Amino acid sequence: MGDSKTPLPPGAERYESFSFNVRLLTVMGVVGMVLLAVLGRTFYLQILQSSNFEERARLQQQRTVRLEPRRGKILDRNGRILAVSVPVGSLYTNPSQLKQRKRVAQRLAPILKIRSRKLVAHLKSKAPFLWIKRQLTPQEVQQIQKLEIDGLKFLPEFRRDYPAGELAGALLGFTGVDSQGLGGLEYGYNRWLHGEEVAYVVEKEGMFRTRPEIRDERWEFNQHTLHLTLDSTLQHIAESALRKGVKRVQGKSGVAIVLHAPTGQILAMANYPDFDPNRYRRYDAAQQVNAAITHGYEPGSTFKVITVASALNEGIITPTQEFFCEEGRFQVADRVIRDSRPHGNLEVGQVIQKSSNICAAKIGMEMKPAQFHDYITKFGFGAKTRAGLPGEAAGQVLPPEKWTRVDHATVTFGQGILASPLQVVAAINAIANEGEWRPPYVVEYAEDESGGRHTEFFNESGEVLARFGPKAPRRIIDTAIARILTRFMVSVTERGGTAAKVAIPGYKIAGKTGTSQKYDPSLGRYSNSKFWASFVGFAPAFQPVFTALVVVEEPPRPNHYGSKAAAPIFREIMQRALLLMDVAPETPPTVVVTRPATPEMTVDPATFEAIGMQDLD
């Protein structure tokens, strides 16, 4: 048979060759398609999606920490720094980097003044970025650096510093650890003091090993420095006198305010007990507030100036008209009104000088409730002064349609009305300004980072967001009437007045004492043992430079009178203020009195305008 091969059918070789070529082309096609897909994917990833992957890689390698910027300064009228942001270091870590956390905590604890056990628990966090303590002192930073502990890092931040400590603390307010204003001017003007936040980038390598930090350079953008009307020296004088005076009479608290009489600028605003914003956590909330604007009190006899001014301006009474003071006891409906001392007949000026409740009630009741209420509101009571101080209270004035006869009588001597100390001093400042009420204010202007001065800020719609500096005054009473009231108030500080000891050699002081009982909600009546003692006035009386008010809360008997608790503080502040500003001694005008023919005679205000400042004693 042999081994001869079976011959292939015709065309078989050509078929086998074709089949091989098809398979080869198929494989090559598949390989080509795969290569094309790979190349396409590579092009897509490396070219079209490169920025996206770079961003992902960056996010994996970096952590962005949002830090607060440097706040604008707060300066007094002479450019002295009251608040400033200083650079500090803040300690952070990635806990996974730390070895021997317990040992690290033990070494850090005494420096940071944190219990070691608490620090160990804190370092157990699994967060890749962990604050250990922020806003360290330079000494703390230096001590920690000397420890040379791997994994501990610092980021630069700013801490708010108040170089003068307690000076104007309640007025300035304070900021939190994130540089946000939490009280006082810091809170009220946070929008302008606070710049834009800073993006601070921390790069990571491997297991969050940090590379050198990358700093964003927007540290001082868009914040403003506030320039105040406050005078640091006068503020210190007011705080010192208030602290000493309240302690002397063993009072609970006190407030002192000094205005620049012609403009309404707030030169000093003191609170006792005082408050250091550098250590705000050590104080309770009651000590952090500015009682000069937030606390309402019954102004007592200081309000008699408003009563007499209103009646005189209406022409209902005359300056020398006499009123019978009922020998110290006057029945109004179911209420008995008393004077501290019995009086017979008193002229209007003597009602102020001797501070008669009974005659003040009789004068006030000569006016209709709506008529009197209108003057009360014109003098600024029942509404915020809009001095630019956050947290200001509007006070409380009962609507005239709700007045009873007792309400009508008692409001004349400052009972049944709530007012802030700032409202009272602003009202009396209207007398100093010959009948014009001038809005008090504390911010003169805001300065931007390029040195531009701003007295107004607007939103995108053109609405005013803030307005600084002086505002337009409004006339309340005629000039002649205001001058008469000034003379009446001068008699208070002269022989025979309730505050003769306030007199300062070389100057005429226009003033008024105030003593009011505190309402006790638990008793449902006025307390017989708790009082507000106050004194308000301006000097020099006939060319006023300063208007000031002192209020002392709860001075115990027998020092509960305004003449004993508040007047001595006022005298010390005013005397030192006159010396500080080098105010020349005043020579009072020579005046002549022409008495009316009858007590009922009314005097045209134009008459007093013509005769100027008259001595009506």
What does each model-found stretch correspond to?
Residues M1-Y280, A291, G296, K368-G382, ...:
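Periplasmic/cell-envelope proteins involved in peptidoglycan metabolism and beta-lactam response
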Residues G2-R14, A83, K204-E217, L230, ...:
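Beta-lactam-recognizing serine transpeptidase/beta-lactamase-like catalytic domain environment
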